């Protein structure tokens, strides 16, 4: 998605998460108005790039995405010459973006993470115990489905507060997508997600291991997370103000080691912060604009 050209334009290449695709056009509009040229990428086997014969979202090697990210950046460079590139990633896309930045030093002007999946929910202790087990399973049965659990609250919350059977907080417009529901193509973003193959999870945990042991980037990082996690079965107001997928405390802790210049920002919002209530979204956009102006612009 391309924006208008401005003096000191900042280039953004946005990477979505698992069970996801780019539809956050409000975020793109806000950043274009702030002077950024915004581009988004649906990675292979996701969203607009998904083909009928493909297994949605599947890979056993996260570096495979280097190809399309690299091609996208080359295309941006052809149009935007030497303007700074800021890579942004949400959830799994945040992990992929971080690893790409690690493998390509000197390319990025900055990295923005929106609930970036930098570590398993129980930190490296759980990963260290589980990785050998998952590795053995993946070697024998790559597509074996790992039980993933989860409450399904996040997908349900995206249908909006109006259908939630909960009280709608004062001040929220009935027309706002956080109330009316986000316009989602369910073929590309499924309410209950889809199976987790063992070989895919092995690749994710290998990425987490690299982040923990090897990643130290040469660019500033903005890591945005929710103020709280909520993983209980009860359907309540907290599903709209918490991360119901990942642990934001773990993400923030892991983010601190990504670079010498790391900004942590917390918001009372959902797993994808730009799909939260309108006041939270405005705070997220303001934080990104301020950070870009301070460290990139």
What are these regions, as identified by a protein language model?
Residues 18, 42-47, 117, 268-270:
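Short beta-to-alpha linker loops that shape the active-site pocket of alpha/beta-hydrolase fold enzymes
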Residues 2-43, 50-52, 238:
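Short, surface-exposed "cap/lid" segments of acyl-processing enzymes
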Residues 261-297:
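Catalytic active-site module of serine/aspartate enzymes centered on a nucleophile-bearing elbow/loop
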Residues 19, 47-80, 84, 281-284:
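Catalytic nucleophile-loop/oxyanion-hole region of alpha/beta-hydrolase
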Residues 39-41, 114, 265:
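The conserved SAM/SAH-binding core of class I Rossmann-like methyltransferase domains
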Residues 148-261:
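Serine-hydrolase catalytic core
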Residues 92, 96-195:
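Alpha/beta-hydrolase-fold enzymes
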